[in-house]
């Protein structure tokens, strides 16, 4: 067995069943092995399109995307889409290959890592065959948990080397974060509940994290309990389309009527949302509101802007349910006039 076959095995064991690719010297043997193992390939005319396709696939299906480009000039073509995927927190593995490590000259040889790192992604050079399986497993685990693209570069002469040490080259199971892994501190929930109780015009802003966690019922229940209006970030548009107190999309794409309502809010509860500048219209959308950020990775500062006053590190669904249980029933501004 060749190493490129074992690498393909690990990818398949991690659930990769589709790959977006443009082939060349450094990735064609691996791609052939992936195809033989039943992986469906979507071939593109440009490397940018391959990575963009994998990013869209990852976002649509909620799984790790897979793309592949050849080394050197194949890799440099993804420098536009790669930072986009980084900033969108898209989990993705990009198999790029590398120039042969056993040659002193190769016409497509460049130092690939600085290009990738400059985009904010990580570059893992697969040069140590003794730890190859661990390196690939670590990349999949990090892409999943940190929601980020990782580029794997493996010299194609190493890919074609034979080996017999199959046990070392097996996939490790990725531990998926669930509510059982989350320790909701009672003090934080109590503080948040107090802020919600004091609010007269709260708004719940749900993002893709709420969609992924299937937290819509929990968000609706929290809104009904706290008297809050409902809204979403642009990527989560339509989540509350069937709810009567729905403001629609927040930010620059909000309707004028919704913007007028947002401007009066005194508390925003971000649930599974990034609290990006666009979602708050650069801070102009809710100028007088405090912000609670409920997310697996909550942040006080986002894109150089103060974004939240209270951070709740929790799964969107179970965090919203915990808040609902802690909040006393109140009308807020859920009145007939607001329909």
Regions found by a protein language model. Give the residues of each.
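Conformationally flexible catalytic loops at phosphate/diphosphate-handling active centers
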Residues: 138, 142-198
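Phosphate/pyrophosphate-binding active-site segments
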Residues: 2-3, 130, 153-154, 166, ...
């Amino acid at each position: 067995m060749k190493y490129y076959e074992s690498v393909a095995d690990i990818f398949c064991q991690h659930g990769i069943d589709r790959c977006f690719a443009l082939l060349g010297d450094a990735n064609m043997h691996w791609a052939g092995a992936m195809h033989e193992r039943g992986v469906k390939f979507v071939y593109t005319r440009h490397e940018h399109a391959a990575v963009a396709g994998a990013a869209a696939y990852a976002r649509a299906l909620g799984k790790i995307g897979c793309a592949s480009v050849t080394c050197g000039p194949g890799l440099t073509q993804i420098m536009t889409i790669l930072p986009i995927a980084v900033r969108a927190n898209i989990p993705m593995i990009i198999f790029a290959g590398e120039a042969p490590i056993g040659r002193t000259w190769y016409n497509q040889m460049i130092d690939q890592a600085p290009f990738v790192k400059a985009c904010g992604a990580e570059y893992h050079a697969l040069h140590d065959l003794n730890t190859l399986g661990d390196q690939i497993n670590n990349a999949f685990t990090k892409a999943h948990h940190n929601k980020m693209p990782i580029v794997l570069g493996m010299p194609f002469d190493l890919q074609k080397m034979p080996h017999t040490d199959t046990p070392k080259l097996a996939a490790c199971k990725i531990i998926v974060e669930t509510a059982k892994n989350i320790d909701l501190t009672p003090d934080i929930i109590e503080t948040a509940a107090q802020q919600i109780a004091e609010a007269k015009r709260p708004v719940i802003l749900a993002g893709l994290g709420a969609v992924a966690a299937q937290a819509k019922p929990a968000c609706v229940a929290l809104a009904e309990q706290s008297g809050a209006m409902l809204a979403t970030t642009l990527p989560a548009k339509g989540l509350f389309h069937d709810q009567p107190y729905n403001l629609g999309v927040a930010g620059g794409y909000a309707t004028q009527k919704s913007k007028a309502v947002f401007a009066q809010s005194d508390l925003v509860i971000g649930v599974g949302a990034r609290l990006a500048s666009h979602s708050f219209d650069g801070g102009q959308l809710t100028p007088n509101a405090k912000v609670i950020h409920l997310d697996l990775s909550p942040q006080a500062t986002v894109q150089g802007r103060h974004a939240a006053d209270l951070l709740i590190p929790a799964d969107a669904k179970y965090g919203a349910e915990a808040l609902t249980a802690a909040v006393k029933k109140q009308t807020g501004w859920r009145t007939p006039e607001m329909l």
